[in-house]
């Protein structure tokens, strides 16, 4: 094989890998009639270490996954693909036990990853019939619930990042959601966006934008757009890490 042929072959493989990764990120329409949701992942390279998925479950339930692998580029993309694959496999055997699910994912990821490779992850199950959100936070930036009255709550219960330790244990948390409440799940690339002076947008910037826009916008998709625009205005679109945001609104 000539050098030119090798370049073409690698380029084709790279495009295929990008397509596969984008296929993992899904927020299909009509997953649940009880929730309005939207998500976006903005990567700094063709392949990245962030991911999100909105998955339909039985009985008007849906799952939200937001993850962030350590590192950047191809290595991070492979790690997050491993996490997503492990999650789908483990879900077949653990049923509704979210703590057991994350423990199984951690075991699989740790066994199949190199040393010091890990990923943070938030996994939440929204029940449309009860309004209850059950979740496990595996070392991830705590998602924020902004209630209709303006009060806020962080979703912190869980355990260590997956793949970091062989025998991590996890705990399940839950919260009762009401009509008009919103959940914001994100990766650190969103809140660590910095301006020219090196100041980070931070959780404060996210909360300010989210709380403000939540009062004047009714659509989750609009909120995602407006929050990314607010971050860009602050950082002048200077992005050094993958940034992901998912918004779920209780209808």
Language model feature labels by segment:
Residues 2-184, 226, 237-251:
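… and, occasionally, acidic/histidine-rich disordered N-termini of signaling adaptors
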Residues 209, 216, 225-229, 233, ...:
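Terminal helices and disordered tails flanking the catalytic cores of nucleotide-processing hydrolases
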Residues 145-148, 194-200:
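Cytochrome P450 core scaffold surrounding the K-helix E-X-X-R motif
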Residues 190:
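Short Ser/Thr-interspersed hydrophobic loop/turn segments at strand-loop and sheet-helix junctions
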Residues 200-209:
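Divalent-cation-assisted or electrostatically stabilized phosphate/pyrophosphate-binding catalytic cores
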């Amino acid at each position: 094989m000539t050098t030119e042929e090798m370049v073409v072959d690698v380029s084709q493989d790279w495009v295929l890998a990008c397509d596969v990764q984008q296929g993992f990120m899904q927020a299909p329409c009509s997953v649940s009639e009880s929730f309005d949701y939207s998500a976006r992942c903005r990567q700094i390279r063709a392949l990245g270490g962030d991911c999100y998925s909105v998955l339909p479950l039985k009985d008007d339930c849906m799952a939200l996954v937001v993850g962030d692998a350590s590192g950047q580029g191809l290595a991070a993309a492979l790690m997050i693909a491993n996490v997503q694959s492990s999650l789908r496999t483990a879900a077949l055997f653990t049923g509704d036990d979210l703590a057991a699910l994350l423990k199984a994912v951690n075991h699989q990821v740790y066994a199949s990853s190199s040393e010091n490779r890990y990923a943070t992850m938030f996994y939440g199950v929204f029940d449309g019939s009860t309004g209850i959100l059950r979740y496990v936070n595996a070392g991830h930036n705590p998602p924020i619930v902004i209630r209709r009255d303006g009060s806020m709550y962080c979703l912190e219960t869980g355990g260590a990042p997956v793949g970091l330790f062989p025998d991590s244990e996890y705990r399940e948390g839950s919260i009762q959601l009401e009509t008009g409440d919103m959940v914001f799940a994100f990766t650190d690339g969103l809140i660590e966006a910095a301006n020219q002076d090196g100041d980070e947008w931070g959780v404060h910037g996210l909360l300010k934008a989210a709380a403000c826009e939540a009062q004047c916008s009714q659509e989750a998709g609009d909120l995602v757009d407006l929050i990314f625009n607010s971050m860009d205005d602050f950082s002048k679109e200077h992005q050094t890490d993958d940034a992901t945001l998912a918004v779920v609104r209780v209808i």
